[in-house]
Amino acid sequence: EISLGLVGSEMCIRDSYLPETSNAKFYFDNALKLLYILNTTTLNTLMLHASVVTQAGNGYAFLGKSGTGKSTHSQLWLRYLEGYELLNDDHPIIRLMDDEVIVYGSPWSGKTPCYKNKQACLKAVVRLEQASENKIIRLRGIQAYAAFSPSCSGMRWQREMADAIHQTIVAVTEHCRLLHLKCLPDEEAARLCCQTIHER
């Protein structure tokens, strides 16, 4: 059975209704994702297009356009930096809770089967860009907002949801470090990113 918790209700659906030989599971999965977004956006909650690693209860999200190397960068952290694990590799969930931004695993993790029912305090968000050398800068204000916003899912044409998305993004920019990393897919990029995130 597939159990789905929605705001104010619960749903239980038998997966035997979804034929393996059709596209039913693909469409059903996307419908659930849409329902989740519709039911949680106004609750200080956003679904991201990102890859997230965690260590000691803290989370670090890597954003970027499709093909930028989010999954690759996460794998570099797992390979070269001690104590990190993958939380989600495609669509993690974030929520503002008591002046902290919490990042959660989700049932949607793209090509990487990483479906963890875990959470962490989101400490930093890094927008990745492919480049010929490794360089990182801290983002603040409107630059931080502009870097984070494109990776947030939601129905922005609906006023109430657009306002909720805006408020949550502002909260993230106030509570988390946001950075822009131009990088190669190498160990140096992972170490530079990690070091900069943890600088005081």
Go through the PLM ranges and name each one:
Residues 27-46:
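N-terminal pre-Walker A segment at the start of P-loop NTPase domains
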